[in-house]
C-alpha cells in the first residue's frame, strides 16, 4: 500500500493542473474542519479521500482504482489508530500540499511514505495494546 500510494503521489504531482491542486487543497480543508473527537469515522473518511483525489489526478483509470482501494484500507488504518493521530495526519497533509505546490514529486512521495510508515507503526502499537489504547491517549 505504501509503495502504491507513494508512486501515485509522484505521478499525480508531475501531471496535476492548478485546478487539481486546488481540489487537493479543498480535500485537506474539508478534513481539517471536521471534529476528530465527535465524529472520527467521518473525519477518517475525509482524510483518506485525499488519496482518491490523487489517484484521479494520475489520469490512469486502473491506477486510480487501485489507489481508491488503498484509500479504503487507509481509512481502516485511521480508524485503528484513532483520533489521537489527527494532528499528525493533518500536519502530514499540509506538508504534502506544500511539496505538491512546489511540484516536487520526490519530496511529495517521501512525505507519503514517511507518514504512512509512522501510521503503520501506530497501528501495530494499537493492535498490540488493545484497540482503544491509542485513541484514548488524546
What label would you give each PLM region?
Residues 3, 18-80, 91-98, 107-119:
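Conserved amphipathic alpha-helical segments that form helical-bundle/coiled-coil interaction surfaces
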Residues 11-19:
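A eukaryote-biased feature capturing mid-to-C-terminal, repeat/solenoid-rich segments of large proteins
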Residues 61, 81-83, 124-128:
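Short, charged/polar low-complexity linear motifs in solvent-exposed/disordered segments
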Residues 85-87:
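Active-site loop of classical SDR/Rossmann-like NAD(P)-dependent oxidoreductases
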Residues 105-138:
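C-terminal effector-binding regulatory domain of bacterial HTH transcription factors
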